């Protein structure tokens, strides 16, 4: 039993939408009594143990309208092992469509009248009402024969031409009313430098120019008071509002970036609000499992990661340590170079291991002391011996420096000022999100250039060009065949091949 304004959601196999028998009767009754509010098609293989496509059917006891909202969310997911998984942006796209109940969202949702459903014999199969399929690639026969770029294929990019109204004329020259040609040498540079595209990027930068400061005021200044549970939704509305006047950028892609970042922000906020601001200056024992026993292996920041603190507050020490680690990598490469310099005979000596892929340190010293190798080999061995000594010293230094850096980082975190903590939280929470958001226009333009380049290159080589290349290759091969000599049977075979190539 449900209340008069109650809602029921049921997960069902996709087949219940169109099968006959008792399922068809139930479907008819639900439609006739105006109980189906929405049908949401989910990706296949989303539940463990079964790969069948499923739906969510939303039922209302007393609906105010008679339409059924049909959402095809089957294309929005990410792989999670063997299964498919809805991302945060996929879920929000579904929820927003359900709340807003639009007349139509291209390739995603549509509000269907009860009359249309009855006309279709109560068949609710989602593809009948929402076509989410991708357009199949086609080949223009005229362009394949004569070259040129079909206007019809350029119109598939109409959203970009609307956003960049003068770009198309700058890139293409018309051959006739149906075909055109590219008139720039470097497509990517021409697109990215065009005033319309520059204006697009500028508009995005202006929309988010003060977003860093906004996030800082909300998250950093208000970290102890804000409602973490509802803040993500508030921030998503702010992002959507800023994107309202920006074409092409998918607001749900921006939401996914926020959600990815919010996971760590929410955890930190909960710690700060429950344990106090002092928790940001706390370090915890890093407990690891060794031989079935839990033991401490150094320390971890309770809120602030060691790596972040090191990069910001101890960058000189980090740089010195990284330089030594880089040198160790270079030494490994120098070993390989010296191995390549050895003759095959030298590689059979004891100072090279059985796999012939490394020097043996002790045997290198013995060979140098014995002085029984050629001068060139002796020079190589002395260099290798020096590398062994340098490597040994560096490894000890790296180990000691890493331990010292780790211990000093613990002390730095514990003695941070409040202002330093706020700066580090800004770097942890806000800067990564801003960097990812600011990359969205570039991702849009990269995808546009890739699609445009594909269309332009599609008809670069015509059938006539291919035929000409084949004829040229056959002619060249004929010339080579004329120079061949052999016994009677070889020459008969060559003669027959020349016939096939059109030479006789």
What are these regions (language model features)?
Residues 1-299, 320, 327, 336, ...:
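A conserved structural/catalytic subdomain of Rossmann-like adenosyl-cofactor enzymes
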Residues 305, 313-315:
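Secretory/endomembrane lumenal or extracellular ectodomains immediately following the signal peptide
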Residues 301-303:
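Extended alpha-helical interaction scaffolds
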């Amino acid at each position: 039993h449900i209340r008069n304004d109650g809602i029921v959601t049921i997960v069902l196999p996709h087949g219940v939408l169109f099968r006959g028998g008792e399922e068809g009767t139930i479907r008819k009754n639900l439609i006739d009594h105006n109980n189906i509010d929405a049908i949401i098609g989910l990706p296949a293989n989303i539940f463990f143990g079964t790969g069948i496509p499923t739906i969510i059917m939303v039922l209302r006891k007393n609906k105010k309208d008679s339409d059924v909202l049909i959402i095809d969310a089957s294309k929005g997911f990410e792989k999670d092992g063997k299964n498919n998984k809805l991302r945060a942006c996929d879920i929000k796209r579904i929820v927003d469509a359900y709340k807003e109940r639009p007349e139509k969202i291209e390739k995603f949702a549509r509000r269907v009248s009860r009359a249309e459903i009855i006309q279709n014999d109560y068949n609710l199969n989602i593809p009948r009402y929402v076509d989410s399929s991708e357009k199949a690639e086609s080949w223009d026969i005229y362009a394949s024969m004569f070259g040129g770029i079909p206007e019809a294929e350029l119109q598939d990019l109409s959203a970009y031409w609307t956003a960049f109204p003068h770009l198309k004329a700058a890139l293409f020259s018309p051959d006739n009313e149906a075909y055109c040609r590219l008139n720039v040498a470097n497509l990517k540079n021409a697109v990215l430098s065009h005033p319309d595209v520059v204006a697009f990027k500028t508009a995005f930068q202006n929309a988010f120019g003060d977003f860093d400061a906004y996030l800082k005021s909300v998250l950093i200044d208000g970290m102890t008071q804000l409602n973490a549970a509802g803040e993500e939704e508030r921030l998503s509305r702010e992002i959507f509002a800023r994107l309202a006047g920006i074409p092409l950028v998918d607001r749900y892609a921006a939401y996914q970036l926020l959600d990815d970042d919010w996971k760590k922000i929410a955890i930190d906020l909960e710690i700060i609000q429950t344990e106090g601001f002092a928790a940001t200056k706390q370090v915890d024992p890093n407990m690891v499992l060794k031989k079935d026993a839990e033991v401490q292996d150094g320390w971890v920041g309770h809120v602030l990661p060691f790596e972040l603190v090191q990069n910001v507050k101890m960058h000189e020490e980090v740089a010195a340590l990284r330089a030594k680690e880089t040198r160790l990598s270079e030494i490994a490469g120098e070993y390989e170079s010296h191995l390549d310099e050895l003759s095959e005979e030298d590689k059979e000596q004891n100072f090279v291991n059985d796999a012939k892929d490394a020097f043996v340190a002790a045997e290198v010293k013995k060979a140098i002391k014995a002085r029984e190798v050629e001068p060139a080999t002796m020079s190589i061995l002395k260099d290798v011996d020096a590398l062994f000594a340098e490597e040994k010293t560096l490894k000890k230094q790296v180990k000691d420096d890493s331990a010292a850096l780790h211990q000093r980082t613990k002390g730095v975190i514990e003695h941070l000022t409040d202002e330093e903590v706020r700066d580090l939280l800004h770097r942890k929470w806000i800067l990564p999100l801003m960097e990812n958001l600011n990359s969205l226009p570039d991702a849009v333009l990269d995808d546009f250039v890739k699609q445009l380049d594909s269309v332009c290159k599609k008809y670069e080589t015509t059938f006539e060009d291919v035929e000409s290349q084949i004829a040229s290759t056959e002619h060249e091969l004929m010339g080579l065949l004329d120079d061949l000599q052999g016994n009677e049977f070889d020459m008969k075979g060559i003669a027959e091949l020349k016939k096939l190539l059109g030479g006789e």
